[in-house]
């Protein structure tokens, strides 16, 4: 029996990280027990030698499960999906499954990396705070427009139907962070706005939103 079979999972996370937020939602939706390990990015705790041993890039989240270390939100969620197939996050229908992958990829490749803390700090340093906000909003709008087109005709109560799926784990944190952190007007994106309304009514999504909103306000002040 491997050590991962018997040891409690540890999640290294930062409260304001939308990437880590995805994993926390997945763990709760699957009903999995885990130990929360806070990593304060503002204090540079992600750059300590101890943390860099877990992820040389210095990013959160990181999941440790026995002797298994995974340092990427999508990789972590796919590991959880295969290791713990109960309460699945991916539908059996191949078209819906592909839609979930595409929506998650738009967030992970075309939105979040271009407006994360490190990138925005660099842009502010080089070009000023006004350009930082303009940059972030430009890439969020571009990604949200693509998501609206992708999910049109496929969304139900949630992104790809009436059951929570992988796509929702990536959309919910991104949408609320865009509204609260960057002042995005979701009236331009009616489908995503409708999804966000549904997320706010769902226990595991709502719990995370209620915690993150005041933290974002504090971080901006």
From Swiss-Prot:
CDD domains: GST_C_Zeta, GST_N_Zeta. SUPFAM superfamilies: GST C-terminal domain-like, Thioredoxin-like. InterPro entries: Glutathione-S-Trfase_C-like, Glutathione-S-Trfase_C_sf, Glutathione_S-Trfase, Glutathione_S-Trfase_N, GST_C, GST_Zeta, GST_Zeta_C, GST_Zeta_N. It catalyses: RX + glutathione = an S-substituted glutathione + a halide anion + H(+). It is an enzyme of class 2 (transferase). The gene is GST1. Its EC number is 2.5.1.18. Residues 93-221 form the GST C-terminal domain. Residues 7-88 form the GST N-terminal domain. GO terms for biological process: glutathione metabolic process; L-phenylalanine catabolic process. This is Glutathione S-transferase 1. One of its GO terms (molecular function) is maleylacetoacetate isomerase activity. Induction: Accumulates in response to the phytohormone ethylene. Keywords: Transferase. Belongs to the GST superfamily. Zeta family. One of its GO terms (cellular component) is cytoplasm. Coiled coil: none annotated. It comes from the Eukaryota. Conjugation of reduced glutathione to a wide number of exogenous and endogenous hydrophobic electrophiles. The lineage of its organism: Eukaryota, Viridiplantae, Streptophyta, Embryophyta, Tracheophyta. Glutathione binds at residues 17-22, 60, 72-73, 112, 116-118. NCBIfam families: maiA.
């Amino acid at each position: 029996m491997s050590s991962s079979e018997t040891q409690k999972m540890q999640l290294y996370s930062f409260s304001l990280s939308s990437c880590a937020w995805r994993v926390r939602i997945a763990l709760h939706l699957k009903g999995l027990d885990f130990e929360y390990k806070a990593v304060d990015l503002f204090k540079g705790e992600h750059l300590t030698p101890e943390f860099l041993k877990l992820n040389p890039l210095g990013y959160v989240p990181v999941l440790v499960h026995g002797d298994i270390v995974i340092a990427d939100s999508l990789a972590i969620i796919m590991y959880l999906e295969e290791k713990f197939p109960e309460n699945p996050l991916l539908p059996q229908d191949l078209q819906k499954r592909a839609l979930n992958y595409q929506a998650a990829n738009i967030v992970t490749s075309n939105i979040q990396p271009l407006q994360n803390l490190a990138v925005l700090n660099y842009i502010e340093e080089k070009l000023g705070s006004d350009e930082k906000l303009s940059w972030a909003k430009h890439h969020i709008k571009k990604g949200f427009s693509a998501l609206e087109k992708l999910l049109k005709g496929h969304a139900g109560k949630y992104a790809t139907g009436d059951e929570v799926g992988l796509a929702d784990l990536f959309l919910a944190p991104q949408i609320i962070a865009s509204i609260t952190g960057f002042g995005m007007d979701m009236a331009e994106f009616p489908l995503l706005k409708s999804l966000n309304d549904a997320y706010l009514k769902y226990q595991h999504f709502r719990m995370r939103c209620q915690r993150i909103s005041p933290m974002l306000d504090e971080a901006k002040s």
